[in-house]
Regions:
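Glycine-rich phosphate-binding/catalytic subdomain of phosphoryl-transfer
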Residues: 1-184
Length: 184
């Protein structure tokens, strides 16, 4: 992807964003793509916001003009502080990324609004989190998901996630520990 392309300083675009922000950054993170697009003049003039596809669909279903995002989707964009439950504005500034382009990150689960017909629309959650919730979800469960990518996920113990596994926001303020890789 674009994040793996070489940037002028010798690093990849993802590597440059990681060096500037202090956060892990890889192709696939929304802010890696946005960083590349900004640096290469590809952000349309007048663009006011970015969000994930599920956030956009939910926003449109509710007739809203500004997206909101669950922490599980916000974290997938990158430069997200898990402890604060928000994007890291200092890291965004170091990378030259305007914070006002990002959706509001919402802690917890909530109704986003209603459709024009009055049907409730919940704030979407990440696919890894939704898969764990639907297929496992109990404290001692482990979910192995194999597809184009693979994920091994379990709830983090109260003492914290072990090294080598990625902590991801989950529902109810909990975190999933996830090991992920490509299968194909």
């Amino acid at each position: 992807g674009r994040g793996d392309l070489p940037a002028p300083g010798g690093l990849s675009w993802a590597g440059e964003l990681a060096a500037l922000s202090g956060y892990e950054a890889a192709t696939g993170y929304g802010l890696v793509t946005h960083y590349y697009n900004m640096k290469n003049g590809l952000v349309p003039p007048g663009a006011v916001s970015l969000c994930t596809a599920p956030d956009y669909v939910a926003m449109r279903l509710c007739g809203l003009e500004k997206p909101r995002t669950h922490a599980s989707l916000a974290a997938s964009l990158g430069l997200f502080d898990l402890d604060a439950g928000s994007f890291d504005h200092a890291a965004l500034a170091r990378a030259g990324l305007p914070a006002d382009m990002l959706p509001e990150a919402v802690r917890g689960e909530a109704l986003l609004g209603e459709t024009a017909g009055g049907l409730p629309v919940a704030l979407p959650i990440g696919d890894n989190q939704a898969g764990f919730l639907g297929a496992a979800g109990r404290p001692d469960d482990v979910l192995l998901n194999l597809g184009t990518s693979s994920q091994l996920s379990a709830l983090c113990p109260p003492s914290g996630c072990p090294e080598g596994l990625e902590p991801r926001p989950y529902i109810g303020g909990a975190r999933l520990m996830t090991g992920a890789g490509l299968c194909g």
